[in-house]
């Protein structure tokens, strides 16, 4: 299946499959310092266009909570084929259970 990816920043990490498995890791497009109890939208700096009748999922890795103390507030983000416009940048809504620093590219 062909997926069209638009990168909105030259510093955004390019998408690639993980070494073992079928998933693709997303990475923060900029640095974030999130205080305990705060909500943030982690911007991945990309737009993805998939074929009609397909969807993309944004889900946390098992290490996301362990490493950062972040919980994805919507559980699973579903991006359907219509969310592919110029301003439809993929983001992950998170809640911080402790102060954390997410570096660009992580």
Language-model segments: residues:
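DUTPase catalytic domain/fold
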Residues: 1-106
């Amino acid at each position: 299946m062909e997926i069209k990816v638009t990168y909105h920043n030259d510093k955004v990490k390019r998408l690639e499959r993980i070494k073992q498995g079928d998933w693709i890791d997303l990475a923060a497009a900029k640095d974030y310092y999130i205080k305990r109890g705060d909500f943030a939208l982690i911007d991945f700096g990309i737009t993805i266009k998939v074929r009609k009748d397909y969807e993309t999922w944004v889900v946390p890795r098992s290490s996301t909570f362990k490493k950062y103390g972040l919980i994805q507030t919507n559980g699973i983000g579903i991006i359907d084929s219509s969310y592919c416009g110029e301003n439809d940048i993929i983001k992950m809504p998170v809640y911080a259970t402790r102060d954390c620093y997410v570096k660009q590219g992580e």
